[in-house]
Amino acid sequence: ASDVYKRQVPIVSKVTGISLARHATEIMLGKKLKSMNLKPRPCRFIGVKEAVFPFNMFPEVDPVLGPEMRATGEVMGIADNFGMAYYKSQEAAGCILPTSGKVLVTVSDRDKKFIEPIARDLISLGFKIVSTGGTAEYLRGQGVETEVVNKLHEGRPNLGDMITNKQIDLIINTPVDRTSMIDDSFIRMQSIQKKIPYMTTIAAARATVEGIRSAQHVKVSPRSLQEYHS
């Protein structure tokens, strides 16, 4: 079986409370599905799976993803709502989302229309937004308050100084044009070295907002699988 599918089985089993491996073995041994008394069951909680990457062991390597397999494992967060489940999944992967502080936002032109509501949500949650020139110009044009920071080639102080000095608590950076490749690569590598959570897609940024919102309003606490399935 594919390694991908083999990793899905235990995760799906934990979320559903059904031992898929055991039932699959029984079927291979000749048992019929009808005799297993399997019935649809409502799921009262949400599970979010997250991949674990070893980039922290290679701080000089750009953590950009490609077609090759780089994940060394997977973790999962379970909670009563998506936001908390996502927050737990990030925490389990070693990426603890902040509940306050400054967010560096620098996105491609195609993502600017999507980042505006995310920036507004972050401000409503108590965060301050820091953006590079193009992103800041767009956000300000939409009435979103943001601090402007220089890119690496635009002089000091710049975004590199803020990251190095740990003045940034969260990074939202989507891939942009070739002229920004050096900045993007630096941001990704520095975020790992300084243990700053970073998001490289709009979908991840939206999920992060939901996770932070849940963590601000509900205490993050562990629960056993037995409690979830009782």
Residue ranges and their predicted role:
Residues C95, S100-F127:
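Glycine- and Gly-Pro-enriched alpha-helical subdomains that act as flexible
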Residues N150-K151, L159-S230:
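Peripheral docking tails and interdomain loops at the edges
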Residues S2, P10-K14, N37, E60, ...:
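Short acidic, glycine/serine/threonine-rich loops at helix termini
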